[in-house]
Amino acid sequence: MKKITIILSLICVLAISSCEGFLDVTPTNQADSSTSITSAADAQVMINGLMNKMTSSSYYGRNFVLYGDTKGGDLTIYTAGFDDNMYYFAHRAEGGSQIGFWITGYDCLLQANNIIQGIEALKEEGTTGLDDMLGQALTIRALIHFDLVRLYGKPYNMDGGASHGIPVVTAPVDASAKPQRDPVKKVYDQIVADLTKAAPLISKSKSNGYVNYYANQAILGKVYMYMDNFSSALTAFKNIIDSKAYTLYTPANWVASWKSQFGSESIFEFAMYPNEGDLGASSLGVRYSRREHAHNSAYGYFLASTYWKNIMGKNDIRWGIMTFDHMRGQEARSDWDDCCYKYLGSPTLAGDGKSTYTAVNIKVIRLSEVYLLAAECALKSDKATAATYLNAISKRDPDRPAWTAATINEDAVYNEYRRELLTEGKLFFEQMRQNRKVTFEDDAWGFGTTSQYRDKTVDRTFFRAILPIGIDEINSNPDIYQNPGY
């Protein structure tokens, strides 16, 4: 796409022309990846810059996480007009959050590719100590492609990956090039190739705020699940679980875990800092806050739906991260707690140990999710093992009977996934992979919040289940394929 190439080329030119020397005018802990890599130290600074860019509001810092939950039916809205375009599926090619996904995603791919190219050039010259950083960059490149293809392409298992995905970009792109959308299968093949190449290079040591071998395996496992390769996915997940490198939170410390950074379950989380990635009044925490609680601009945007609350047990410890909404007040029953405070640390705005309670890290991969995905995979061949994995998480409700090989099923795993991962940006993507219908609690409060863009119940055949390509992209390259319906 010409638009992509123009964006990528301008980023390179501006970054290079604005810097007299590598670290002359940039922070010492991060830099734009289009500057030259001359040492291992340079490569690390470049990776820092890439990780920081991925925490922007148009990616993991807010919108990508919102997308995965507001479209999944376990959240509803109090009233219309407050950041609700994703909930309504009001996507349009002329503008909106999907434009930010596209631009930021390809910006990050540019940086990842420049890091990879620079490191590989140094390795050819004989520089050592670069394997881990190369493995990190390859893993992140795979993750970005994975995110983009899920936003703009149909699920792999919907048609075997035959439909249009996104342009695979694995090298700096010349401004005259016009890369077209590759088939979903080709995108997934590249993702698997990057993750497989990275696995023997990347360190198994924990590195807070960065990907390691276990993050690589978790991403690989999820990718394989999208390809219906459950045996390979289970192998990847078992590599994590059996290593015992991470441990599940006990029921007693699950709630408090949200007040800490890089806990025992955290396989990969983006670090958010008050002076760098903190979005303040525009943060995820404020989006999920009760009205005017976390900030005077908090409108009580998104609340847990009755559908989610109905699958929660009365004594489930996960109620501890929820609190009352602005309509009912604190005297309401505990099972009316609608507001999720994971991104504020606690209902008392504890944060996660920084000077501002809105600069809370984004937990991308937790061990709890790995257990639940492993349970789904094991269910295909070993129900007893699947029950063991599921029980490790479901015991967070002390009243829930243990699952057995005779009682476990796909819905049991799916509903536990919903309980555990509310507001973590996962649900809608999983629903599309599993070919599930999504029902929305529209008009929950009687204030006319029914969507004009979708029905009350949708599935993955609905054209708005994937995003449109932006009109600027279409105008710059008329040959690019627009998703049907837009």
Protein language model regions, located:
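Conserved, well-structured interaction surfaces
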Residues: F82-Y152, D182-P183, P200-K204, S355-I362, ...
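Bacterial Sec-dependent N-terminal signal peptides
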Residues: K3, S9, A15-A41, I191, ...
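Membrane-proximal, proline-rich intrinsically disordered regions
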Residues: C19-L66, Y288-H293, A298-Y301, I311-K314, ...
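TPR-repeat structural position
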Residues: Y188, F230, K383-A384
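Extended ligand-binding clefts on enzyme/binding-domain cores
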Residues: D228, L234-K238, D242-S355, V360, ...
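Short, surface-exposed recognition loops and adjoining beta-strand edges that mediate ligand/DNA contacts
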Residues: S33-S34, G61-Y78, G153-A162, K204, ...
